[in-house]
Amino acid sequence: MRTRDRDSEFKDFYRHEAPKLRRLALMLTGDPERASDLTQDALIKMYTGWNRIRNDDPSPYAKRVLVNLCRSAYRRRMLELRKAPTPPTDVVDKEGRVEEALRVAAALSVLSTIQRAVVLLRFYEDMTQPEIAQILDRPLNTVKSDLRRALEKLRPMLVDNIRESR
């Protein structure tokens, strides 16, 4: 295939998927700059392998690459800092409920990286559990367990916050 066609296909993919990938990276990392860097790294990996992956649906593969990069970055950061990540301060949902978005971000920050990824892919990206298992390269039952455990951790924090806000 000619380079122009390849580049044109990738540009279309980039326009459609880059904003979604950056939002996912932001939710996973809590840091806008790190999210942008990791998104670009994921897109570079996608571009270099574009001839190999473009015939399949590249979107799930891009999410998998991004999640793996976020996990690696998180591990490196934890080795360096030895402290918990801070919740994102600029996450606002569509209705502009800043406080609620910050509460959710703070609650998500107590989850492990993999649990956070499973929750975000399930509820933020509206993916099915089999799709999540494929993206994260984990057995389906493990993804189900990760989701259940994550929700068990989140439920008390978010239910208490809902009661406090009333």
Can you say where each PLM-predicted feature lies in the sequence?
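A short, charge-rich alpha-helical start-of-domain segment used by transcription regulators
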Residues: 1-23, 33
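C-terminal edge and immediately downstream basic/flexible tail or linker adjoining helix-turn-helix-like DNA-binding
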Residues: 2-4, 9, 152-166
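A short pre-motif secondary-structure segment
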Residues: 118-122
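Arg/Lys-rich amphipathic alpha helix in sigma70-family domain 2
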Residues: 64-85, 97
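DNA-recognition helix of helix-turn-helix
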Residues: 67, 136-160
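Structural recognition of an alpha-helix C-terminal capping motif at a helix-to-coil junction
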Residues: 37-44, 48, 56-68
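C-terminal flanking helix
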Residues: 18, 22, 43, 112, ...
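Helix-turn-helix DNA-binding module
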Residues: 109, 113, 125-142, 153
